[in-house]
Every structure is written in structure tokens, then in C-alpha cells.
Amino acid sequence: MLLFTLCFFADQENGGKALASPPGNWQKADVTFDSNTAFESLVVSPDKKTVENVGVPKGVPDSPERFSSSPCVLGSPGFRSGKHFFEVKYGTQREWAVGLAGKSVKRKGYLRLVPEERIWQKGLWWLRRLETDSDKLQKGSGKIIVFLDYDEGKVIFDLDGEVTTIQANFNGEEVVPFYYIGARVSLANL
């Protein structure tokens, strides 16, 4: 799937011509969840590879890094240049989003998951009951791959073969993996 996706990107960027190998030097990032940023109902596994929204506040201390009103968590490492990608496994639940956020993303108060808030994301939502979303849920768990071409200002999502590209202006800011995890949802970095 990854090779197909990278070749698809190459085809799009190369005027419709297929390439024999993946474009550029995409680096797979070994992403972990940053428990210091996790909303109070999110439980990060000891190896920092899985996160679950248990729906009940854990009584963790507040800090400037922690999301206070939205069930979100950031990941690491962060990126300031280059081409990187990471993969996330999701289950049959809906109400999650995966992507990237500026390191300075707002942590306190209501958070809108939009580029104006320094968040570039893709996910499955209860409020957007698209036929394709229902099809994904019936198949069970799946995978989303997030590609970042920092220097070109592109975030590319491959959600089980459905490719979406978002143009982004990072303004030189470090960007980090971003996750929104709804009630009773779990996600795993691969």
C-alpha cells in the first residue's frame, strides 16, 4: 500500500507519468504519544505507542502543555524540514482524527480542528456520515498514513487508499503529530 501511495504521489507530481520508485527521500518517523500533552481522559500505554480515551478523567495535574477541553494528544518527534511519514492503526470506532499541528497549537479552551488553528487533520466523524465512512467501519480496523513534505508545504493523507492533499503554510514553525480521540476510541502508532 505504501509503495502504491508513494507512486501515486509521484504520478500526480510528475505530470501523469508513473515512476519506477518512490519519489524523494521519505523518512518513516518512529512516532510516540506525548503523555504530558494528553487530555485527562486519555490513557497512553507505557511504550507510548497506543492511546485510548477511557471517557473518565484520570485526575492528572494540569500543565501548560496538556489539552484541557479537547480529547487530544500530540506526538513526537517534531519536524522543521524534509519529507516524513507515519502510520496509525484505528479500530471500528468513529470520532477520531490524525494529522499534524504546529508546536504552538492552542491547548486550553475550545479547539477547532482547522488549519487556522495550526491543525491539519483527517479522520472519521459521527457527524459526517459519508457512505465511504460507513464502508470503512464495516471492514473493521484500518490504517491512515500521514505524509509531510515540510519544504513544499504539503500534508498528504492516505486513509485506506483514499488520498487527500492539504497545502499548508508552516511559517518555519515545528510541526508535531496530532491526534483527536473520541470516547471509547483507541489509536496505535505503527
Swiss-Prot record:
It comes from the Eukaryota. SUPFAM superfamilies: Concanavalin A-like lectins/glucanases (SSF49899). It is found in: Secreted. GO terms for molecular function: toxin activity. Residues 1-20 form the signal peptide. SMART domains: PRY. Gene3D superfamilies: 2.60.120.920. Expressed by the venom gland. Keywords: Neurotoxin, Secreted, Signal, Toxin. Residues 128-190 form a propeptide. Neurotoxin that produces dose-dependent hypolocomotion and hyperalgesia in mice. May directly act on the central nervous system, as it is 6500-fold more potent when administered intracerebroventricularly than intraperitoneal. Belongs to the ohanin/vespryn family. This is Ohanin. It comes from Ophiophagus hannah.
